Amino acid sequence: MIYPILIFILAGLCEIGGGYLIWLWLRASQSPLFGLLGGILLISYGIVATFQVFPTFSRVYAAYGGVFIVMSILWGYVFDKQTPDKYDVLGAIVCIIGVLIMLLPDRS
């Protein structure tokens, strides 16, 4: 189960990092280079997600959505200094429970 978790984390870093760089370019008046690098990271995210071991696109992307939520909250805390409130934390916990419900059952 370590490999899928690492792929989810790498995908999240690519997607959130790419989106953040584009945000900085367009909303914080950073150099267009931020936008270009952000676009490259977003394309990389789409490629990294295909390395998942789960058989269906829908399950991979739905489960990744929960991971994305948690990582986005952590990204905001680390890079934007936005402390999550109790509702952010509770929502993230609910999402991870949903991810585990989707991915852990043996469907064979």
Curated annotation (Swiss-Prot):
GO terms for cellular component: plasma membrane. Pfam families: UPF0060. It is found in: Cell membrane. The chain crosses the membrane at residues 5-25, 34-54, 60-80, 84-104. It is a multi-pass membrane protein. Keywords: Cell membrane, Membrane, Transmembrane, Transmembrane helix. The keyword Glycoprotein does not apply. NCBIfam families: PRK02237.1. Belongs to the UPF0060 family. This is UPF0060 membrane protein Sca_1835.
